[in-house]
From Swiss-Prot:
The name this protein goes by in its record: Agglutinin-1
Misc note: Binds one manganese (or another transition metal) ion and one calcium ion. The metal ions are essential for the saccharide-binding and cell-agglutinating activities.
Oligomer status and interactors: Homotetramer of four 32 kDa monomers which are post-translationally cleaved into a two subunits: A and B.
Source species: Cladrastis kentukea
SUPFAM superfamilies referenced in this protein's UniProt entry, alphabetically: Concanavalin A-like lectins/glucanases
PANTHER family: CONCANAVALIN A-LIKE LECTIN FAMILY PROTEIN (PTHR32401), LEGUME LECTIN DOMAIN-CONTAINING PROTEIN (PTHR32401:SF47)
Any one GO MF annotation of this record: metal ion binding
Length: 293
């Protein structure tokens, strides 16, 4: 081990036990603080009876260890009028109330939407919400929202001061609901309402594995989603948003899906997530201790 402090090298005295104990305790506390500021996990598949996930309504894990968001019959067929959600158990610290720091995050997942017809419904979403979030209505609301905040035309679709609708989502919408959707299937970003504030047309492929990556940059305050099928051009949609003004300090992340009279199988095949608050500049006294470690 090389120590950079010249005076310390010249004394050639070992660190005293009290100082070593202090440094050890300091590093342990530092680790604990950092661990609450960041979170990462990876599911290459979804083992049965996973204790890391919260299942709501019809969500389940299949015998093939895929995450099925909506109800599937014993014969493998999707059911009508189904709502299901799955959330990661450990909450994510999205921002720090005491410092105003905002987290960056990135999530990547692969999925397949499979329908017995070419008219599926209704879609699924990756979403961020308060830790005590509960399922919303099915059909076009994707299990995310209740009918009262379907649309707020006076504020571009955002439900103003609606504490029960603290949700940011990236939706993969397969069914066109005329009252709140563009006239095509789309990937959209929703903020407190099922009416997407940003969206792009999406060519759904029946039963084909797709990949999505969603990221948030706190410096630019930009939320970006990139979606692709094999051998196709990736689709990108982004939105400028200060998540600190929309969501609480602690949140949960997960998936939500629904069917109506039209049906589909919403399968999440793999999922990874990582988040971290912006690192603060080290204090002068911390730098002094670090010289001796």
């Amino acid at each position: 081990m090389t120590i950079s402090n010249t005076n310390f090298l010249e004394t050639k005295k070992p660190l005293s036990l009290p100082l070593l104990a202090f440094i050890t305790i300091y590093l342990m506390l530092l680790h604990r603080v950092n661990s609450s500021d960041s979170l990462s996990f990876t599911f290459n598949n979804f083992p049965p009876n996973s204790e890391d996930l919260i299942f709501q309504k019809d969500a389940s894990i299949s015998s093939n260890e895929t995450l099925e968001l909506t109800r599937i019959s014993s014969s493998g067929q999707p059911a009508t009028s189904s709502v299901g959600r799955a959330l990661y158990y450990t909450p994510v610290r999205l921002w720090d109330k005491s410092t105003g720091r905002l987290a960056s995050f990135k999530t990547t997942f692969s999925f397949a939407i499979t329908s017995p017809t070419q008219d599926p419904g209704d879609g699924f979403a990756f979403f961020i919400a308060p830790p005590d979030t509960t399922p919303g209505y099915g059909g076009g609301l994707l299990g995310l929202f209740n009918g009262f905040n379907l649309r707020n035309s006076s504020n571009n679709g955002v439900a103003v001061n609606n504490q029960s609708a603290q949700i940011v989502a990236v939706e993969f919408d397969t069914y066109i609901n005329g009252q709140c959707d563009p006239k095509y299937r789309h990937v959209g970003i929703d903020v407190n309402s099922i009416t997407s504030l940003a969206y792009t047309q999406w060519q759904w492929q029946n039963g084909v594995k797709a990949t999505a990556q969603i990221s948030y940059n706190p410096a630019s305050q930009k939320l970006t989603a990139v979606t692709s099928y094999p051998n196709s051009t990736p689709l990108t949609v982004s939105l400028d948003i200060d998540l600190q003004t929309v969501l609480p300090e602690w949140v949960r992340v997960g998936f939500s899906a629904s069917t109506g009279q039209n049906v589909e199988r919403n399968s999440i095949l793999a999922w990874s997530f990582s988040s971290s608050l912006t690192t603060l500049t080290a204090k002068k006294e911390d730098m002094y201790i670090a010289r001796y470690v």
